[in-house]
UniProtKB/Swiss-Prot annotation:
It comes from Gallus gallus (Chicken). This is Gallinacin-2. Changing residue 17 to A: In strain: Xinghua. Belongs to the beta-defensin family. The gene is GAL2. Residues 1-22 form the signal peptide.
Amino acid sequence: MRILYLLFSLLFLALQVSPGLSSPRRDMLFCKGGSCHFGGCPSHLIKVGSCFGFRSCCKWPWNA
């Protein structure tokens, strides 16, 4: 029965980190004016930091 609690807590943690369920406002707070992208940045943007989870904070080169 204790392992069931552990599985539910891990599932809850995984759902919080997933990109579709996180708050866009919280991501923008971490990014500070850039845009958050899952994984790496597109080729025309540069990485300036990280957003919540596995996202990269990307900005235009002339705004960085």
